[in-house]
Swiss-Prot record:
This is 3-hydroxy-3-methylglutaryl-coenzyme A reductase. GO terms for molecular function: hydroxymethylglutaryl-CoA reductase (NADPH) activity. Residues 1-32, 242-250, 298-348, 399-439, 564-1048 are cytoplasmic. The chain crosses the membrane at residues 33-53, 221-241, 251-271, 277-297, 349-369, 378-398, 440-460, 543-563. It comes from Aspergillus terreus (strain NIH 2624 / FGSC A1156). It is an enzyme of class 1 (oxidoreductase). Pfam families: HMG-CoA_red, HPIH, Sterol-sensing. Belongs to the HMG-CoA reductase family. CDD domains: HMG-CoA_reductase_classI (cd00643).
Length: 1048
């Protein structure tokens, strides 16, 4: 069933808007690479256009120091303030920027306070020149500068009191100031006049200095408010990443939202500057956080949620049978990713557009009401930015979602993310009604405009003079009582004593640039950027860029189509032909998109209502310790049992393995090493974990495929068999096969079973050595043996106690129980019998003071090479022999009988004795034992004692007689790894699977004989290779890469 989409009424505004959005989104998503490329190129071109406009102005020689025209005093007066002092103001300074002329037509005593801002740490060498020359020529007088009057700590300030009528001449005189170095000088940077262009470096430099100046003279509360606004904006960005992470994207979707917003701002700025609307950089700096907080990122999140919800619903519909009368192709067509995004636009497109229209309308109203104000200009820019952002949301960002879903479909066909329809979307994870969202945004935008209209904060909305024509920062109105306090104090004292009414104009600090021999440093810095632009504008640069563009377009377009070709065949393979139903587990395999809060998932788990928990939620519960990693199988088995869906026990166990892999990959303490486990090449699917659970392995994360070969056939006791061998060592199976061939030529191998009894040796402690000796005598007595055997044999119908071997060490007593175990290897069986026998010994033997230290005291001796096993045997004691004709030795084994006999004596017997070997009188019996053990599901660790072997060879009548004696072969055909399907199949290959129908233990004994025969074949072939000198060549051919050839 297709997802239900609430369609607008035909002919209405909503219907027409939705229809238009569908067409736009469909076209963009069907050509994703083209859409992304066009958007990026448009934004980049606009950015370069704005950037290049400011740069080329400087490149054409319009920098202030490049002009030859006289200085314009009025340009330096921009941002100045005039204060008056006289009887009218009760001899207090009063700001009065209006021109004032005395009755006789002469101006009152009018001074100008000029501060020279010189870059550099020392200006002492220039002070004599300035103070002497200027005072004689112009009557200018140097006064003490006000502390912190320079905007930068590495600048120095000089303050002069100049008659206002001589200000023009003063500025001409101080245009160039010599430095302490002969070749260096400071050159005055005159401010731009209205309509004149500026350079990028000058714009950035002046903006930075002005920013420092404003920060230094701003109120603390203003700085705190701005800091809090930027902190809140950053929190909004962090919240965007958090929500997108909950939706299944850790980085790219949130980054794409920010990139789309940046593109919208650049394009909006380009349109604003094209319309000759000045951009107040200070107000832009202050207003962007409020714009981000007001608009937020809810609309991209809303569209993302809708797309993922529709995708999940269609994914569920794909797995359901096609209804009667419906076309399967139509069902598949509805799941094309562009159609998925169109269905999402049908759901949420109108509401997103309506929200955009409300915000743009509010900003447009602000631009209309304040056309000549900085607030109006900012509203103009913000309105265009939002309009372009809306266009990019349904083109650029929709294309990003399309590519994201395509990639997800490639990685996991049919699993593009799940959405829980029972949990509606909200603002950053909180449930909020859509009407509340609209009213809240409207009120926020209205409050934002109202706050700017009332100009509540003097720092935010301070009038800063006339605007620069190209939208750079306007000059700042100085604060005379902060920047010229010392100069005003000196003038105040003089005026008060003489009694003259005085006017003082405080100019903004004059900025200087340090030059060396007429060479300006800033010009050098700009030349690098100039070279880049010139290189890009050259024919070769344009050709390279165009070629890279074409190649990128073709390759990316091909990759997108290849992704679609890759996804659809897999989807068609999973479809059910002829309308038949498909059984799908209710627990989805894809990660949850609309995730629930942790408290809700924990409550579902505790209340046994966890059937709706998704894989991601279960992984998070594991990482938080709410589900133990080892109990995932039990948890999911319980969930499956209580689920209404037909989830089998095997499905639950397989899901447990998948979740454990993800949990291990995301464990913080090991993530740097294990993060790739979930997607690694370690397989986990298509395995019967029901057989593994509770029997073979815990904390399962998959299974290891091991190469399996067969040696033979080999005639063993008159029956021909292929011997399965699982190994990663080359030559081993080939060598054993050669040994089988040689043995078959002599009539095959003959085996003998010399003993069958598994052992367990507990350790007992007594109060004294005397009591331990008494216990030993009791155990070795007929009564003790009878009591222990009766208790032991009662625990199993196969376990029958054979012998008891006792050893004492001080107060410790060791009893070695030896017993038959049927077709099982018998470790668990004998442990249970020993436990019951010891209880009978304490109760009936009169040893209540006996204490069982451990059930296994290493007197067994299990999984360790020991003389007691070599001499007394453990498990099955087997001998295998064969006679190989001399001709076969020469033809097949490529050696002779005497050479083999001598090698065996010198290597396997004398050599092992020289090494002090214990049970290691063989060439490589362990190789064959381990390979057969792995293939047939035996305990690999018991290869230690099972491979104890002595190989003997003798020349009898010119033929070779070979035998292997293995006193402690520990094998079984039931229990342990033999229950696994693959290992059981190999036991079937040998005809020994499970328990023998009529003779308990016959299958296990038969398997021991086969292992001994395999060892016999391996020993024969390897010793022959050593005698003939072929071992190294064989390994280089079968187990090594080819050696490097040497040039002649």
């Amino acid at each position: 069933m297709d997802p239900v989409v609430k369609k607008p009424s035909p002919g209405g505004v909503q219907h027409r808007v939705t229809k238009g959005l569908r067409a736009i989104v469909g076209h963009a998503c069907r050509h994703p690479i083209h859409t992304l490329l066009v958007t990026a190129l448009t934004a980049a071109t606009t950015h370069l256009h704005v950037l290049e406009g400011t740069y080329q102005a400087a490149h054409r020689g319009l920098a202030p120091w490049a002009k030859e025209t006289p200085l314009n005093v009025q340009s330096f007066l921009c941002g100045s303030r005039t204060v008056t002092l006289g009887e009218a103001s009760a001899w207090r300074w009063q700001i009065d920027d209006r021109p004032k002329v005395s009755e006789d037509g002469q101006s009152d005593f009018h001074w100008a306070l000029v501060t020279l801002d010189l870059p550099g740490a020392s200006v002492d060498a220039s002070i004599p020149f300035l103070s002497n020359t200027l005072s004689e020529f112009l009557g200018a007088e140097q006064i003490t500068p006000t502390p912190d009057s320079s905007p930068s700590p590495d600048h120095s300030a000089l303050t002069f009191r100049v008659p206002y009528s001589q200000l023009d001449g003063f500025l001409q005189a101080v245009e160039i100031i010599p430095s302490e170095k002969e070749d260096d000088s400071w050159r005055l940077r005159s401010p731009r006049e209205e309509g004149s262009p500026t350079s990028l470096g000058h714009w950035v430099g002046s903006s930075w200095l002005s920013f420092l100046h404003r920060v230094k003279h701003a109120e603390t509360v203003d700085l705190v408010i701005i800091g809090l606004s930027y902190l809140a904006m950053n929190m909004t960005v962090v919240s965007l990443f958090r929500v997108m992470r909950q939706l299944g994207s850790r980085f790219w979707l949130a980054t794409s939202v920010l990139l789309s917003g940046a593109f919208a701002f650049v394009l909006g700025l380009g349109i604003t500057t094209t319309c000759d609307v000045p951009v107040d950089m200070l107000l832009l700096f202050e207003g962007i956080p409020y714009l981000v907080l007001t608009v937020g990122f809810e609309k991209p999140i809303q569209l993302t949620r809708a797309v993922l919800c529709v995708s999940e619903e269609l994914r569920g519909g794909w797995q359901r049978p096609v209804p009667n009368g419906a076309s399967s192709d139509d069902s598949r067509q509805s799941q094309l990713i562009p159609n998925i995004i169109q269905l999402a636009v049908d759901r949420e497109g109108w509401y997103i557009v309506r929200s955009y229209l409300l915000e743009i309308g509010a900003l447009a109203l602000g631009a209309v009401l304040r056309p000549n104000d900085s607030l109006g200009h900012f509203c103009f820019l913000a309105a265009w930015t939002l309009l372009i952002d809306a266009i990019l949301l349904f083109t650029f960002y929709a294309t990003i979602l399309c590519v994201k879903l395509e990639i997800t479909r490639i990685r996991s066909p049919g699993g593009l993310g799940q959405v829980n329809a029972k949990h509606p979307s909200g603002i950053f994870g909180h449930k909020v009604k859509s009407t509340n969202i609209t009213w809240w945004k409207l009120l926020t935008v209205g409050g934002f405009v109202l706050c700017h209209f009332l100009q509540l904060s003097p720092f935010f909305y301070r009038v800063m003079g006339e605007y620069m024509a190209n939208g750079t920062l306007p000059p700042t109105a100085v604060s005379p009582f902060k920047e010229a306090a010392n100069g005003l104090n000196e003038i105040y004292l003089t005026a008060r004593v003489e009694g003259f009414e005085t006017r003082v104009t405080v100019l903004p600090p004059l900025q200087y640039a340090l030059e060396s021999a007429g060479f300006n440093i800033s010009a050098t810095k700009r030349s690098t950027f100039d070279g880049v632009l010139d290189g890009l504008e050259s024919p070769l640069g344009r050709l390279c860029l165009m070629g890279a563009l074409v190649v990128s377009l073709v390759l990316n377009n091909h990759l997108i189509h290849a992704a679609r070709w890759h996804a659809w065949p897999q989807a068609r393979e999973s479809a059910v032909p002829d309308g038949s139903s498909l059984s799908v587990p209710c627990s989805a395999t894809a990660p949850e998109v609309c995730t629930r809060p942790p408290e809700e998932t924990e409550a579902l788990l505790k209340s046994n209502q966890a059937e709706s928990l998704t894989d991601d939620e279960l992984v998070e519960l594991c990482l938080r310790g709410k589900i133990a990693g080892y109990s995932l199988e039990k948890t999911l088995e319980r969930i499956a049992a209580g689920s209404s869906c037909s989830v089998t026990r095997l499905d639950a166990f397989t899901r447990a393995v998948r979740i454990r892999r993800a949990a291990v990959s995301k464990t913080p303490s090991t993530q740097n090493l294990c993060s790739g486990l979930a997607e690694s090449l370690l397989p986990y699917r298509d395995y019967n974990y029901e057989l593994v659970h509770g029997a073979c392995c815990e904390n399962v994360v998959g299974y290891l495929p091991l190469p399996l070969g067969v040696a033979g056939p080999m005639v063993i006791d008159g029956q021909a068999l292929f011997i399965p061998m699982a190994t990663t060592e080359g030559v081993l199976v080939a060598s054993a096969s050669r040994g089988c061939k040689a043995i078959n030529a002599g009539g095959g191998a003959t085996t003998m079973l010399k003993g069958d009894g598994m052992t367990r040796g507990p350790c007992l402690r007594f109060p004294s050595a005397q009591r331990a000796a008494e216990a030993q005598r009791w155990v070795e007595s007929p009564l003790g043996h009878e009591v222990l055997a009766a208790a032991f044999n009662a625990t199993s119908r196969f376990a029958r106690l054979q012998t008891l071997t006792v050893a004492q060490a001080g107060i410790y007593l060791y009893i070695r129980f030896r017993t038959t175990t049927g077709d099982a290897m018998g470790m668990n069986m004998i442990s249970k019998g020993v436990e019951k026998a010891l209880e009978a010994m304490a109760a009936e033997g009169g040893f209540p003071d006996m204490h069982t230290v451990t059930l296994s005291g290493n007197f067994c001796s299990d999984k360790k090479s020991a003389a007691i096993n070599w001499i007394g045997g453990r498990g099955k004691s087997v001998i295998a022999e064969a006679t190989i004709p001399a001709e076969t030795v020469r033809q097949v084994l490529k050696t002779d009988v005497d050479a083999l006999v001598e090698l065996n004596t010198a290597k396997n017997l004398v050599g092992s004795a020289m090494a002090g070997s214990l049970g290691g009188f063989n060439a490589h019996a362990s190789n064959l034992v381990q390979a057969v053990f792995l293939a047939t599901g035996q305990d690999p660790a018991q290869n230690v004692e099972s491979s104890s072997c002595i190989t003997t060879m003798k020349n009898i009548d010119g033929n070779l007689h070979i035998a292997v004696s293995m006193p402690s072969m520990e094998v079984g055909t039931i229990g342990g790894g033999t229950i696994l399907e693959a290992q059981g199949a190999m036991l079937d290959l040998l005809g020994v699977r499970g328990a023998h129908a009529t003779e308990p233990g016959a299958n296990a004994r038969r398997l021991a004989r086969i292992v001994a025969a395999a060892v016999l074949a391996g020993e024969l072939s390897t010793c022959a290779a050593l005698a003939a000198g072929h071992l190294v060549n064989a390994h280089m051919q079968h187990n090594r890469s080819a050696g490097a050839t040497v040039k002649k």
